[in-house]
Amino acid sequence: MTRLRTAIEAATATLAAAGVATPRIDAELLAAHSLGVDRGRLMFVDDPDPEALAAFEHLVAARAKRIPLQHLVGTAAFGPLTLEVGPGVFIPRPETESLLEWAVAQQLPRDAVIVDLCTGTGALALALAQHRPQARVIAVEDSPAALEYARCNAAGTSVEVLAADVTAPDLLPELDGAVDLVVSNPPYIPEGAELDPEVADHDPAHALFGGPDGMAVIRPIVALAARWLRDGGKCAVEHDDTTSARTVEAFTHDGNFTDVTARHDLTGRPRFVTATRIARS
């Protein structure tokens, strides 16, 4: 067994003992990061230099303390993107890619206006901009730390990153009736929910919690979408897996939407709700 293989086996055992959900995958990704190679190339590395091995062991020790893998390597994958992440910004989750797939499948004008509310790293906005290069894509975020990451990730793209609070009354009235698609992965976890250490200790609370019932940001987003969307425009909002019915009710109670649909992610859990703006009378 090579030195690297031995080190990865030891790291896997360490991470498993620490309660990491995917110890082997994390060990291999940390090894690849330390060596500066793709994970698939690890099998071709026989004898890593001592500095790389020491760096790997340092990262494993940090991961065993439940520091997020993405913070340790500095990036997170989302759809077609690799995004810069770190302390102060919510790490994009694979579950949100189900919402992305739905959004990509929508029939929109070539020059559509798309708004991503609570953009965080810019994940949804940037992925949609890549799929729809002719669209105007606006990413809205109110956290200064998250805005830094969003602007960094959006550098060199056409995505417009705006600093604004999505719960503020009369936000951006110039968009009233002009938006084709609104998407959002907002703070939605009900206060008091039990979370893994990676989330509770390292994701910003501002990006996680949506008030006592998880709906404190979702309800204003529904009202905002009703104002911004053109007739027939589409909206998709992610929610906690315990609040699907509440999110459906928020759209239904607003009275400006039809085709309100609860949707699931790839694991089969309730994940987001979609709706269509009804025509104005």
From Swiss-Prot:
It catalyses: L-glutaminyl-[peptide chain release factor] + S-adenosyl-L-methionine = N(5)-methyl-L-glutaminyl-[peptide chain release factor] + S-adenosyl-L-homocysteine + H(+). Its EC number is 2.1.1.297. It holds the Pfam family PrmC_N. Keywords: Methyltransferase, S-adenosyl-L-methionine, Transferase. S-adenosyl-L-methionine binds at residues 141, 185. Signal peptide: none annotated. The keyword Manganese does not apply. Substrate binds at residues 185-188. SUPFAM superfamilies: S-adenosyl-L-methionine-dependent methyltransferases. InterPro entries: DNA_methylase_N6_adenine_CS (IPR002052), HemK-like (IPR004556), N5-glutamine_MTase (IPR050320), PrmC_N (IPR040758), RF_methyltr_PrmC (IPR019874), SAM-dependent_MTases_sf (IPR029063), Small_mtfrase_dom (IPR007848). GO terms for molecular function: nucleic acid binding; protein-(glutamine-N5) methyltransferase activity; protein-glutamine N-methyltransferase activity. One of its GO terms (biological process) is methylation. The keyword Metal-binding does not apply. It comes from the Bacteria. Belongs to the protein N5-glutamine methyltransferase family. PrmC subfamily. Methylates the class 1 translation termination release factors RF1/PrfA and RF2/PrfB on the glutamine residue of the universally conserved GGQ motif. This is Release factor glutamine methyltransferase. It comes from Mycolicibacterium smegmatis (strain ATCC 700084 / mc(2)155) (Mycobacterium smegmatis).
